[in-house]
Amino acid sequence: MKRTPLILLFAALLLTACDPGYTMEFAIDNQTTHAVTIQSLQPVDTVGHTISRLTPLSAPAQTDTVVWVTGGLGHASINIIAKDIEWHNYGDSVQLRFDDGRALNYYRDSTGFDALYRFEDANADTSLYRYEAIVNQRPPFKGNARYGKLTLVITDSLYNLSRPRP
């Protein structure tokens, strides 16, 4: 009988000390009338190490498609998904290729005409993506987000920046 309060105290400490899990999604909201494919431009670095494991991601015209899901211990954060996308999937540059042969390149830490969006930097041109964090109210004493979704929004104005490419 004396063990019951001790077991309850131990269970309460265990529940409050646990680092809960989170889920992050990366989606493409293609608002154009063209299908789009995202592909890595530099799958290996200068010494031959593979830096991109990305197979091309495709989004049909006028769809909102979840293309990648990750998770782990801790809480959802835009920085987590942005870093995971760059370092684990894209490498340092990607190309958005539309079904009519037009394309737009994005390079990390570049300021050129085609470098309007940097996947590793949450502050780079926020008009191109949106981030949503949902706070799980259970347990009530933990207010961190358990779910996050980063959506790359491809609009007609972005399509108009693209150029014909071979």
Cite the ranges covered by each PLM segment.
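Sec-dependent bacterial lipoprotein signal peptides
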Residues: 1-18
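Intrinsically disordered, low-complexity segments enriched in small/polar residues
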Residues: 18-25, 39-166
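A short, amphipathic beta-strand motif
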Residues: 26-30
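Short acidic/proline- and small/hydrophobic-mixed sequence motifs that coincide with surface turns
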Residues: 33-38
